[in-house]
Amino acid sequence: MKEVAVYQIPVLSPSGRRELAADLPAEINPHLLWEVVRWQLAKRRRGTASTKTRGEVAYSGRKIWPQKHTGRARHGDIGAPIFVGGGVVFGPKPRDYSYTLPKKVRKKGLAMAVADRAREGKLLLVEAFAGVNGKTKEFLAWAKEAGLDGSESVLLVTGNELVRRAARNLPWVVTLAPEGLNVYDIVRTERLVMDLDAWEVFQNRIGGEA
């Protein structure tokens, strides 16, 4: 990635706020983000939809009436697709929807998604979640101090299991471990909150793509 910009990202600590300079993509490519999201959603598809052909439905193959001299339309067996309960023509069968997306594209997409949140002022780094020990009310108190009031959806990325447990009951918070940070969850939420350990994991993952 050739175009890089220096973003000043706010860092929240028990002693107050400071800023951290970070090199991230200067330009956001919406199509590349779409490609990564499409790849992620394709991987998640179970691909279990299945229909029966006329050869698989539980009907006799006997011709339902003679070809001629009945005054009726010509038909074969009752399992033909034209009849209700008959087989399905070109219906879905179980399949694997996943495909390979180049690792370089995935890394660029992740870097761009985070850069987009930084550019919008929607990225917050956290030094420590002071006072949060696994209870939702503790997280709500911390969130209020951090300026998170539930009016925007938040993606919370931290390796601290107690913090994730405290936040996971809130409908406006999506929690992830640092290794699980992905483009789809970033773009489907409005704010991104990461602790410094998660930020370091992210930097190692994109490794020079920013």
UniProtKB/Swiss-Prot annotation:
GO biological process: translation
Keyword DNA-binding: no
GO molecular function: rRNA binding; structural constituent of ribosome
GO CC terms, sorted: ribonucleoprotein complex; ribosome
Record has RNA-binding as a keyword: yes
InterPro entries: Ribosomal_uL4 (IPR002136), Ribosomal_uL4-like (IPR013005), Ribosomal_uL4_dom_sf (IPR023574)
PTM per Swiss-Prot/TrEMBL: The N-terminus is blocked.
Coiled-coil segments: none
Keywords: Ribonucleoprotein, Ribosomal protein, RNA-binding, rRNA-binding
Pfam families: Ribosomal_L4
Outcome after substituting E56A: Further decreases Ptase activity in E.coli hybrid ribosomes. Significantly decreases binding of a tRNA analog to the A or P site
Protein family: Belongs to the universal ribosomal protein uL4 family.
Self-association and partners: Part of the 50S ribosomal subunit.
Task performed by this protein: One of the primary rRNA binding proteins, this protein initially binds near the 5'-end of the 23S rRNA. It is important during the early stages of 50S assembly. It makes multiple contacts with different domains of the 23S rRNA in the assembled 50S subunit and ribosome. Forms part of the polypeptide exit tunnel.
PANTHER family: 50S RIBOSOMAL PROTEIN L4, LARGE RIBOSOMAL SUBUNIT PROTEIN UL4M
Protein name in the entry: Large ribosomal subunit protein uL4
